[in-house]
């Protein structure tokens, strides 16, 4: 009996000795290919606004990888173009705010002034630089009160590089690209064959296998929403792809960049009835849903209710953890803000700079059903939740 009990320890000792003398390789295992964990569709979407840019400079590979690690459903990006027609991931049409372009003396003569949506904007515009030149620049954090240690570490990435990040993720991660400033891009960048900026965006998506109507089998394999503040661009690409589209909504007093209408006009019931032929949802600025006065949120408008009545999803922007952005009603607590918008306002997705906090809130308040088929999968899910804290 004693010898029997000791046998496992003896075998363990032998294995340890053997392992010290040579490299052990796992035996080959035959089995099906790994199936990625699918996108959840049972609770509001966690949309990583420019990646996890509350922690790492926006629109960088590191920011997107961090967002995936923290549990995002979608990684969001803004699409602009270089001078030579390469699609890049960058938010502003000028490079000044979030790159070190000013320190590159060789580019000092590139500063220009252009009309951008009725405003004269001066700076270093993306479309005045080739991709090779843009790759020499490095990204920096937009806000001074955020972590500055990553400034100067990461380059601008192309749209195709962004798509490979989603493709190579360990689970199904959706993408949420914005067709940014299409009027401006089409004015200053010319593509062969008379193609438009919008054509290039859709062509690139198709090249990487994106397509399919919302919640179709094809869509669920590679989830995608295409967003834009320009309604005519969304109508135009409806002839090119059946992928779901989202109309972004700015301050209601602002005019759209491609029509003579204000955003107040395009949030009317009559306009919703028209645009729902082309889009599956709207992406409003938060203050168009819930007005703010002296940093207090007021009574909500009926925008969400009316959008839902027209079978349109609502994905507001942008949710941020810092006190500079949190309204007093929420006592500097981002979880209170998430609770308000999800459970009282009833939104269908949230653009957030802090993917981790939104993911934690949803896991605590509306955990997904356990679809694990093995203890290994369950341990992997637990590890993904614990990892951010282990690194802290």
Curated annotation (Swiss-Prot):
Gene3D superfamilies: Phosphatidylinositol (PI) phosphodiesterase. SUPFAM superfamilies: PLC-like phosphodiesterases. It is found in: Secreted, Cell wall; Vacuole. Expressed in roots, rosette and cauline leaves, stems, flowers and siliques. GO terms for biological process: glycerol metabolic process; lipid metabolic process. InterPro entries: GP_PDE_dom (IPR030395), PLC-like_Pdiesterase_TIM-brl (IPR017946). Disulfide bonds: none annotated. It is an enzyme of class 3 (hydrolase). Residues 44-362 form the GP-PDE domain. Its main location: secreted. Induction: By phosphate starvation. Residues 1-21 form the signal peptide. Its EC number is 3.1.4.46. It holds the Pfam family GDPD. GO terms for molecular function: glycerophosphodiester phosphodiesterase activity. Keywords: Cell wall, Glycerol metabolism, Glycoprotein, Hydrolase, Secreted, Signal, Vacuole. Glycans are attached at residues 120, 239, 260, 329. GO terms for cellular component: cytosol; extracellular region; plant-type vacuole. Belongs to the glycerophosphoryl diester phosphodiesterase family. This is Glycerophosphodiester phosphodiesterase GDPD5. The gene is GDPD5.
């Amino acid at each position: 009996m004693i010898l029997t009990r000791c046998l496992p320890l003896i075998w363990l000792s032998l294995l340890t000795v053997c392992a010290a003398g040579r490299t052990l390789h796992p035996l080959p295992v035959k089995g099906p290919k790994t199936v990625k964990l699918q996108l959840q569709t049972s609770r509001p979407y966690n949309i990583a606004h420019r990646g996890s840019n509350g922690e790492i400079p926006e629109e960088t590979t590191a920011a997107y990888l961090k967002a995936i690690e923290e549990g995002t459903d979608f990684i969001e990006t803004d699409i602009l173009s270089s001078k030579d027609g390469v699609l890049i991931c960058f938010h502003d049409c000028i490079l000044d705010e979030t790159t070190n372009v000013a320190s590159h003396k060789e580019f000092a003569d590139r500063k220009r002034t252009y009309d951008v949506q009725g405003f004269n904007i001066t700076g270093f515009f993306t479309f005045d630089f080739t991709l090779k030149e843009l790759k020499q620049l490095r990204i920096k954090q937009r806000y001074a009160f955020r972590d500055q240690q990553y400034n100067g570490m990461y380059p601008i990435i192309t749209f195709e590089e962004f798509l490979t990040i989603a493709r190579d993720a360990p689970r199904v991660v959706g993408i949420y690209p914005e067709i940014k400033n299409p009027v401006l891009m089409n004015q200053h960048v010319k593509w062969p064959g008379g193609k438009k900026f919008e054509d290039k965006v859709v062509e690139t998506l198709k090249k990487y296998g994106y397509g399919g109507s919302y919640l179709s089998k094809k869509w669920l394999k590679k989830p995608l929403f295409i967003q834009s503040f320009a309604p005519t661009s969304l109508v135009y690409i409806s002839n090119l792809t059946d992928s779901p589209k989202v109309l972004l909504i700015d301050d209601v007093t602002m005019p759209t960049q491609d029509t003579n209408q204000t955003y107040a006009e395009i949030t009317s019931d009559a306009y919703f009835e028209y645009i729902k032929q082309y889009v599956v949802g709207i992406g409003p600025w938060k203050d168009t849903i819930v007005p703010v006065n002296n940093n207090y949120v007021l009574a909500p408008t009926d925008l969400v209710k009316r959008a839902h009545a027209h079978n349109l999803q609502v994905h507001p922007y942008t949710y941020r953890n810092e006190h500079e952005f949190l309204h007093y009603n929420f006592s500097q607590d981002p979880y209170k803000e998430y609770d308000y918008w999800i459970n009282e306002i009833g939104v269908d997705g949230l653009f957030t700079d802090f993917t981790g906090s939104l993911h934690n809130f949803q896991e605590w308040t509306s955990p997904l059903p356990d679809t694990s088929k093995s203890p290994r999968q369950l341990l992997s899910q637990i590890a993904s939740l614990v990892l951010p804290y282990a690194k802290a």
